[in-house]
Design a protein with these regions (language model features):
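Short hydrophobic/aromatic beta-strand or adjacent loop that forms the aromatic wall/cage
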Residues: 97, 161-163, 197-199, 243-245, ...
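Outer membrane beta-barrel
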Residues: 32-183, 194-199, 203-212, 216-218, ...
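Outer-membrane beta-barrel "beta-signal"
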Residues: 202, 339-357
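N-terminal periplasmic/intermembrane-space "pro-region" immediately following the signal or transit peptide
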Residues: 1-50, 101
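Detector for outer-membrane/organellar transmembrane beta-barrel domains
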Residues: 203-298
């Protein structure tokens, strides 16, 4: 009798222990699921790839090549209602952006950003290549003055830098401002001189569809290589590097158009230019695309370049498109800057995804 009672008690205790463990497991599993759900609710994933075929005829030489231009992936994490973080990597090159935002105001009036990000110089530079009409993406002036790649003194920096930004929107989002304090050396690099670069940006939307933009930069560059455009600046030299731009963007159902005037000062050399780019929707996702772009890399040496683009693009699914363009330029850099007729036919496929729970 006592033995049966002991066995019964043992079974009861064992069942109680297993029941308790099972309950704890369910709670832990439930807690884990809640944590995963919370993380998933706070993270957005994005990515895109651009690549295609280019044919170029320049200086009596024909070149044709398949080209993968960009393969980017980035993640946004909304840590709290005021704190967010972004990480971006280009699998065809390097890590391009990583920064944290803290919104001080209850609305969008004041946000501080710290990390590596696109500088606010020019209208075009902060924009994604997935929204630009040209396969070459930005205008010659923007590419040169913002450090996107055509300025040998700065190198290929993709229009990005390390630093601090303060920005916000007021007046029912009609007015937007931005102030950047940057190293001035580009991505993934320490500052190579004692000075910081200051960039200011002001946008005003007086009416629906129209945006007026003015930007400027004051700073000092540190030359990483010699430049055929400015031969009196030597590698390792610190030099004055100032810029300013004024531009506009207009969007409507019948026409999308943006343009800008740009000017830069590197040491004693002035560069300046202007561009006008737009597209006309033809229906069923097809747009007619055109652009005229003028830029003088060195006004003292008459290093002026004219560029024209004409083509079509087909948006076959949301932000996915196929582009076909003819490009004409009247100058080339091979063997030194010189004027010559250059023709190109470019075809590009763009695939993009955006995921948010």
């Amino acid at each position: 009798m006592k033995r049966k009672t002991c066995i019964s008690r043992t079974l009861a205790v064992t069942l109680a222990v297993f029941s308790s463990v099972a309950a704890m497991g369910q709670r832990e599993n439930s807690s884990g699921n809640d944590w995963l759900k919370d993380v998933a609710d706070r993270i957005q994933l994005h990515g895109y790839a651009q690549g295609g075929l280019n044919y170029t005829h320049c200086d009596a030489k024909d070149v044709n090549t398949f080209e993968l231009k960009r393969t980017l992936f980035w993640a946004n994490a909304q840590i709290t209602d005021r704190v967010s973080f972004l990480f971006m990597h280009d699998f065809s090159s390097v890590v391009q952006e990583y920064y944290m935002d803290y919104r001080f105001s209850k609305n969008k009036a004041l946000t501080v950003r710290l990390g590596q990000f696109k500088n606010g110089l020019s209208y075009e530079n902060p924009l994604s290549p997935t929204s630009m009409e040209a396969i070459d993406v930005y205008s010659e002036g923007v590419t040169y003055l913002t450090g996107c790649g055509s300025d040998p003194l700065l190198g290929v920096q993709y229009g990005r830098d390390l630093g601090l930004a303060v920005f916000g929107e007021t007046n029912d989002q009609k007015l937007r401002y931005e102030i950047d304090v940057m190293n001035g050396q580009g991505i993934n690099r320490k500052d190579q001189n004692a000075e910081k670069d200051f960039i200011g940006r002001l946008e005003y939307r007086p009416v629906k569809g129209l945006n007026l933009v003015a930007t400027g930069q004051i700073g000092r560059g540190h030359a990483v290589a010699a430049s055929p455009y400015i031969p009196d600046i030597t590698p390792g030299e610190n030099y004055k590097r100032n810029r300013w731009t004024v531009g506009f963007d207009y969007k409507s159902a019948a026409l999308n158009l943006h343009g800008e005037y740009l000017e830069g000062k590197d040491k004693n050399t002035t560069s300046r230019g202007a561009y006008l780019t737009g597209n006309v929707p033809l229906g069923k996702g097809v747009d007619l695309v055109g652009s005229y772009d003028y830029f003088n890399f060195n006004t003292d040496l008459d290093y002026d370049q004219h560029k024209a683009i004409f083509g079509v693009q087909w948006w076959f699914f949301k932000k996915n498109r196929f582009q076909l363009q003819y490009v004409y330029k009247n100058a080339a850099l091979a063997g030194g800057f010189h004027h010559t007729a250059c023709h190109a036919i470019m075809a590009q496929m763009q695939v993009r995804f955006d995921w948010a729970k």
